[in-house]
C-alpha cells in the first residue's frame, strides 16, 4: 500500500467509517481508529465534538482539503443565497477534482487531484492543472488525448463500486464529462451520511 493510500485509509480509520464506500477500506474488517489506542471505547461526544467530527469527515472525503481552503469555501457558501450547508456541498461538487472523480476518470479523490496537477485534464478545450478550479454549469471536462489510454484511467471507468451521478453527463468512449447542474446534498452519492448543517453550526460558534 502506498503512502498516499495509507493516508487515505487513515481517514477511514479515524472516522470509523468507510467514507468512500471502497471494498479495500480497513474499517470493513475492524471498527476502531488508527494507532495503539484505537480500540479504546469512545465516550459520548459533546455538541462541539459532533460538529468537529462532521467537519473532519467532509474535509477528509474531499481528499483532505486544508483547513484554510475549506474555511474559504464555507465563507463563500454563506455569502450565496439559500441554505449555507447546501451551498457548501454545491461548491465542493463544483471543484474540478470532484468532477473528475464523479466522472470515473480516476479511482479516488486523491488520484483526481494528482491527475489534474500533472496536466491530464482540459476544461472547454484548455488544459487546467488546478484541482480546486471551480467548474461552471455547461463546462466540458475531458481527459487529454495522450492520457486516455493510461491503464489506471481505463480501469477506473470500469469500477462497479460507484455510479456516476446525474448532474455529470459522461461519455466514456470520448473520456468527456459535462457538468449539468449544481447538486443538492440529496443528489450527491455519499457512501456515508454527511451533515453540512453541523459544519455551519461549528463555524457559527
UniProtKB/Swiss-Prot annotation:
Main function: One of the primary rRNA binding proteins, it binds directly to 16S rRNA where it nucleates assembly of the body of the 30S subunit.
Domain S4 RNA-binding, chain residue ranges per copy: 94-157
Gene that this sequence comes from: rpsD
Subunit structure: Part of the 30S ribosomal subunit. Contacts protein S5. The interaction surface between S4 and S5 is involved in control of translational fidelity.
Annotated GO CC locations: small ribosomal subunit
Keyword annotations of the record: Ribonucleoprotein, Ribosomal protein, RNA-binding, rRNA-binding
Sample GO molecular function, one term: structural constituent of ribosome
InterPro entries: Ribosomal_uS4, Ribosomal_uS4_bac-type, Ribosomal_uS4_CS, Ribosomal_uS4_N, S4_RNA-bd, S4_RNA-bd_sf
The organism's place on the tree of life at top rank: Bacteria
Taxon lineage: Bacteria, Pseudomonadati, Pseudomonadota, Alphaproteobacteria, Hyphomicrobiales
Protein name (database record): Small ribosomal subunit protein uS4
Keyword Calcium: no
UniProt record similarity statement: Belongs to the universal ribosomal protein uS4 family.
PROSITE patterns: RIBOSOMAL_S4, S4
